[in-house]
Amino acid sequence: MNNQKYIRNFSIIAHIDHGKSTLADRLIEHCGGFQAREMSKQVLDSMDIEKERGITIKAQTVKLLYKAKDGNTYYLNLMDTPGHVDFAYEVSRSLAACEGSLLVVDSTQGVEAQTLANVYKAIENNHEIVPVLNKIDLPASEPEHVKQQIEDIIGIDASEALLISAKSGIGIDLVLEAIVNKLPPPKESSDDILKALLVDSWYDPYLGVVILVRIIDGALRKNMRIKMMATNSVYKVEHVGYFTPKKHIADVLYAGEIGFFTASIKQVADCKVGDTITDEKKPCEQALPGFKPNLPVVFCGFYPTDSSEFEYLKDSLAKLHLNDSSFEYEMESSSALGVGFRCGFLGLLHLEIIQERLSREFDLDLITTAPSVIYKIYMRDGESLEIYNPADLPNLQKIESIEEPWIKAIIIVPDEFLGAVLSLCTEKRGVQLDHSYIANRARIVYKLPLNEIVYDFYDRLKSCSKGYASFEWQMDVYAPSELVKLGILVNGKAVDALSTIVHRSRAEQTGRALCVRLKDLIPIQQIDIVIQASIGSRIIARETIKALRKDVLSKCYGGDITRKRKLLEKQKIGKKRMRQYGNIEIPQSAFIAALKIGDE
């Protein structure tokens, strides 16, 4: 099959919970991809976490055969993309593999921030966009109001928006006809030389790495020798095929088609999303535009609660890395926590997913240190560094300036919660860039330091807006800031795992809050425990946990006073020795407390 006018490559753009995966399920069911008895909810979401959280993490594709009302049979390639900001680059590459998009909006909720970000990416990729209003069978549905929102905010004509209910199957045939009639076919291939876009990849224990591709020019055949243009790696293609969503093996993928291939590739890290694949013997002259390496932006430490589990943690991280090359890790040691790993993530959701998979799939109990970001350090001697571990920050006297990453955030929030959201953004050192109204909701654009976002911003935003605010962000610039390293000392010894980098204006407040929290969490011992917060050599906050007093005179019922003095002196010498050699046991809850100072 190589008649491109009967191919439609499309994706579904939607905010979380607006019905993207449910609509995909209905389309698969309607086109006979699965029999009714084989259907399960969210067919394309393969991980348990994806189904439970209602999110899509890995891009998935499905090839459907649809006999349209014009009598022709069409091949519909549905690309189910991640919707969350952490996976924004994967979304942009998945959209680059398609010519059109269905914009699904919940008719009871309206346009959300995440919808905006992804629809703008689709417009950048010159997509034809078909608006679809979902959940029209609910009493709270307001289709006319939401149509107006789509026109006002996004600027596309929504007068002919499709009214559907993915859950009950209303209007699914209208969606399929719109895909055929309104979305364009792939452009005719201008060249016989293979040029393909690498959309996604994952690890299969039997086949090695499976690569999802969109063929732009030429054809991809079994036994062909191919070259990855970003890494110059060469492989021999072993299997070629497509998903319906079951795996089907074919001999060839032609221009305009989306499918998969395997080539005995050992690790996902060798397959860069957005890379161009070409023929080794007759390579194409230019790679496809838009490729960039996926770099982590949030870092934190993972330490096993039991040091004997270190090797198991190492193996578990290696297995996760097979399937997710955007997650990075390296070994590090801490005087307080022992040996663990410093891990890099695309964002906070990505961090949570990896943490949850380690707990669920590998049954690991971990201590997680406070998240941090990459800081650029410019030294007085002209040297420049990039650090993501607060313990690595050099002496402040040697530093000329420190730059931190700032983000551009779009927040859409109902009017009644606007004041609380503006206060939160101001507290987080935000700078307002834009403020506009959409019916009874406000759209605000802020510039915020990423350091302030990674702790508790999202939770507090949801809390102060009762869950109604939606939040979308993208990396903006690095800018100089008055940053300092806030260290924590317990009985004069620095606890590196509790050190954080904070803005100078917030250092004292944060230090006091952390000392108070630690005072409540560290158990009372037989000696005084002094908890201090410091900036360099200056102590800015202190709390003392008074010693548990052991009454050594309880058995002295009178008698010579010198006997009592001797016992008290012996106790004093013992306590001095404990202070000198005794290690204070800091419980796991104390490290978790470092993440939650903002809740005070």
UniProtKB/Swiss-Prot annotation:
Primary enzyme class: hydrolase
Residues annotated as domain tr-type G: 5-187
Keywords, ordered alphabetically: Cell inner membrane, Cell membrane, GTP-binding, Hydrolase, Membrane, Nucleotide-binding, Protein biosynthesis
GO BP: positive regulation of translation
One Pfam family from the record: GTP_EFTU
Subcellular compartments: Cell inner membrane
UniProt xrefs under SMART domains: EFG_C
Protein biosynthesis listed as a keyword: yes
Topology with respect to the bilayer: Peripheral membrane protein
Main location: membrane
Coiled-coil ranges (or none): none
EC number(s) from the headed UniProt entry: 3.6.5.n1
Organism superkingdom: Bacteria
Catalysis performed (reactions): GTP + H2O = GDP + phosphate + H(+)
GO-annotated molecular function: GTP binding; GTPase activity; guanosine tetraphosphate binding; ribosome binding; translation elongation factor activity
Homology family: Belongs to the TRAFAC class translation factor GTPase superfamily. Classic translation factor GTPase family. LepA subfamily.
Its job: Required for accurate and efficient protein synthesis under certain stress conditions. May act as a fidelity factor of the translation reaction, by catalyzing a one-codon backward translocation of tRNAs on improperly translocated ribosomes. Back-translocation proceeds from a post-translocation (POST) complex to a pre-translocation (PRE) complex, thus giving elongation factor G a second chance to translocate the tRNAs correctly. Binds to ribosomes in a GTP-dependent manner.
UniProt-recorded name of the protein: Elongation factor 4
Protein source organism: Rickettsia canadensis (strain McKiel)
Lineage: Bacteria, Pseudomonadati, Pseudomonadota, Alphaproteobacteria, Rickettsiales
